[in-house]
């Protein structure tokens, strides 16, 4: 949830209803109101409803529920003479801009709105940063987004003298908080007029030159970041809310210097989401019609049409919470009112049962214990230096370097355990079952979760045969007659390792640990290890059922 503080009288004046009615309607929008004092209220808003983070956004939604305005809001949009030239900025490559004229806003609320967007879609300015300037104080019609050296000087916000960017990083609170996000190789991103004067260094601080005050009605807005989609969404959210405050949106021509591409900003992109009548009925348990569904969609301030029997919802870009059909159904439920949805008397006669993978993992653990192994449990996170494959998920901001990667095998964890228990009574037989994250180019992220089991023996004298026998027993007990094919890798001794196959499908690896690997982990005794791919085993066993 995101919390905002608003003047209740200003908000109520925009929608002309009483406070209790306001609270009831906000509850329908999954928001809660708490009084602070005579004049102010605190509103908790769902973190995905970024369009509701200002009084104007809230007023827009409530006008729909009151049926004072239906469908997507229509705003005055005009072309301007302003141009933003986007140069090659390596740390934050994307930028868009817009102008808003004659918006009647509360300055304190606008700053709150900006910071709430920074904290949500902006990921504390790492993903998106917003600069809002007094348009009267912008001298140039051509603005450039580019890299500048840290020796560049300007007067930062609320300061009265010029500072270099280096000094801003050292002396100002904003510089200390956000300087590490975008500064690299001795340069900083900057929004600069064509005369060279700096308007801002995103995501750190604006220039004092374009500082907002209570008389500001015309705005120049820049949005920069690491994701073009997030930059476009953020700008659309801001300008649409300012337009609700009576503003006229001015388009800015955006030129990409690298490839000479050109676009008009803000983009005002829309997407079409088809909604099935039967799906709405099933999810909400109500009797309805296509026309009734469209009416509720319009009350939620989106356009809706019925074409050839298909309900087509037009989703504005500032509704970042609408990802698929179920999100539209949720909006319909909010329009109806959750209190108006009657619970159905449904008694389930089904009983819960364990997932097949859970049962298989339990069986493998029981077989491991029966074979004389002691179960251990390691963390899923591991130090990247202990991994054998360079294809792994790296933690971006680890709390400690000891846990800066996600394991892609259980073997490093077992070896680490053996290295710390060489004083224990021999032989040491241990095993572990658990999740790993492995490279998979066919997935949208490039990685997938995999379930595995690994077994290890350490003794004064131990060989391949010592580990093969119990592994063969475990697999045979599962109903798999496997074969072993000699296959070398960097973990095991050449000629003393194999891959485990079942009907030409690889089920795991097994072998004597290479002395170089033992030295790397500080192990002074020989060890043998096997790792089974439970996910692959499950597929085979499922096919046999």
Curated annotation (Swiss-Prot):
Signal peptide: none annotated. The keyword Ion transport does not apply. Its main location: cytoplasm. InterPro entries: aa-tRNA-synth_II/BPL/LPL (IPR045864), B3/B4_tRNA-bd (IPR005146), DNA-bd_dom_put_sf (IPR009061), Phe-tRNA-ligase_IIc_bsu (IPR045060), Phe-tRNA-synth_IIc_bsu_arc_euk (IPR004531), Phe-tRNA_synthase-like_B3/B4 (IPR020825), Phe_tRNA_ligase_beta2_arc (IPR022918), PheRS_beta_core (IPR041616). Mg(2+) binds at residues 321, 327, 330-331. Residues 268-343 form the B5 domain. One of its GO terms (cellular component) is phenylalanine-tRNA ligase complex. GO terms for molecular function: ATP binding; magnesium ion binding; phenylalanine-tRNA ligase activity; RNA binding. Keywords: Aminoacyl-tRNA synthetase, ATP-binding, Cytoplasm, Ligase, Magnesium, Metal-binding, Nucleotide-binding, Protein biosynthesis. It catalyses: tRNA(Phe) + L-phenylalanine + ATP = L-phenylalanyl-tRNA(Phe) + AMP + diphosphate + H(+). It comes from the Archaea. One of its GO terms (biological process) is phenylalanyl-tRNA aminoacylation. Its cofactor is Mg(2+). It is found in: Cytoplasm. Its EC number is 6.1.1.20. Tetramer of two alpha and two beta subunits. Belongs to the phenylalanyl-tRNA synthetase beta subunit family. Type 2 subfamily. This is Phenylalanine--tRNA ligase beta subunit. The gene is pheT.
